[in-house]
Amino acid sequence: MVDLVPPPEAVMDILVKTGAYRRGHFIYPNGKHASHYFQMPLAFRLYDTARILSVGLSRLFRMEKSIAKQIPKVSIISPSHAGIMVAFGVREALSAEQTYWAEIEDGKRQFRQYIDDYEMNPAIIVDDINRSGRSIRETISIVKELGVEVIGIGTIAKFDDAPTDFDGIEAKSLLSFDVNFYDTEDEWRGSRSASDAEVETVRF
């Protein structure tokens, strides 16, 4: 099983080749500047790379006995639309019985209407990137509101300063990445990663 988990170098190679990892000058929605940006859906648009990443993440869950013993009677949950492809890929790799995803509606993260009419299996929360951990924490909250246990958490990539512990559950990832953010353009231009790249405003 371990051989099916791609090393971080292989994961980064996939992200670079598919355009999911980009270098340049990016302004994030919070106004901060960075030299790097991930657009993970570009890696999941291709079957082969999506399969490698999904199987790799799924193996991290299978290697944990407390999770493995509950498969396939588990639900794979994405905190948002961005992680839906990850959720379906991991669901297929684990042969999990259920897949769900949350959405932001009226400023609040929640499931679609009537989801609580059906019994949800123990949950594994997956996403494309763990940036601040906020979406994962909010998803844990709404899952627990349904009386469902969260047994696993994982993402394809995580920022180095992102939280890895959520209520005692270790968040797994295939790649950890050091992204330096700068409050102003002047600060960014003074960094080692600055370039002459044209400014791009990114959106999530």
Model segments located where?
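Active-site-facing substrate-recognition patch
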Residues: 1-65, 203-204
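PRPP-dependent phosphoribosyltransferase catalytic core
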Residues: 2-14, 140-204
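Short, well-ordered alpha-helices that flank and scaffold nucleotide-derived cofactor binding pockets
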Residues: 59, 88, 92, 141, ...
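Short glycine-rich phosphate-binding loop at a beta-alpha junction
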Residues: 66-80
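Short amphipathic alpha-helix with an adjacent loop that forms part of the alpha/beta core around
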Residues: 67-68, 113-118, 185
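A general structural motif
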Residues: 71-73, 120-122, 150
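Short, glycine/charge-rich flexible loops or terminal/linker lids adjacent to PRPP-binding catalytic cores
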Residues: 81-124, 131-137
